[in-house]
Amino acid sequence: MQQTHESALPGFLGMLDSAISRIESFLLAMGVLLMAANTVANVVGRFVLGNSIFFSEELNRILIILITFAGISYAARNARHIRMSAVYDLLPARLRKGMMVVISVVTAAFMFLLCYYAAKYIGSQASRGRVLPALQIPVWVILIWVPAGFFMTGAQYLLTAVRNLTSSGIYLSTHVQEGYEDAEEIEI
């Protein structure tokens, strides 16, 4: 699948959509590559040089958090989240479109609420002054990705609602239209 950062949304919303797409792609690519390099370097260090990298596990933990929460936004952008669509699929197109707007707005609201609670949690962690044992980084710093991921995911769902309100088709995300890519998927 070729990744494009262009948006079908007009004006500022299109720029926001494109910016989020670029951020997601960069964070995911950087996170996966750094995790692979760190793991390989740790294995080589352990078996060839006889010493592990002392901060390897902590770095991978940070990268897992980054990849997870950048990944939820990426999945929303590409309409790859699990959907319970048994009732939805039976509805006529007009009702499906309205339902998609409601689903997108409600999901965005929950994502923004989770962003708020994650930010509050980070505040409580910051006040405790805990640090990672090996890297000596404050614990709250590695959790920054949690509200950032929830915020980007909420923005994706909000932009999906806007896309459905401003376009004639039914969109599962800002650029993924409802339907089957392959006619064979319809056969049972």
From Swiss-Prot:
One of its GO terms (cellular component) is plasma membrane. GO terms for biological process: C4-dicarboxylate transport. Keywords: Cell inner membrane, Cell membrane, Membrane, Transmembrane, Transmembrane helix, Transport. The chain crosses the membrane at residues 25-45, 52-72, 99-119, 131-151. Its main location: membrane. It is a multi-pass membrane protein. It is found in: Cell inner membrane. GO terms for molecular function: transmembrane transporter activity. InterPro entries: DctQ, TRAP_DctQ. PANTHER family: 2,3-DIKETO-L-GULONATE TRAP TRANSPORTER SMALL PERMEASE PROTEIN YIAM (PTHR35011:SF2). The complex comprises the extracytoplasmic solute receptor protein UehA, and the two transmembrane proteins UehB and UehC. Transport is enhanced in cells that are grown in the presence of ectoine, but not by high-salinity media. Part of the tripartite ATP-independent periplasmic (TRAP) transport system UehABC, which imports both ectoine and 5-hydroxyectoine as nutrients, and not as osmoprotectants. Belongs to the TRAP transporter small permease family. This is Ectoine/5-hydroxyectoine TRAP transporter small permease protein UehB. It comes from Ruegeria pomeroyi (strain ATCC 700808 / DSM 15171 / DSS-3) (Silicibacter pomeroyi).
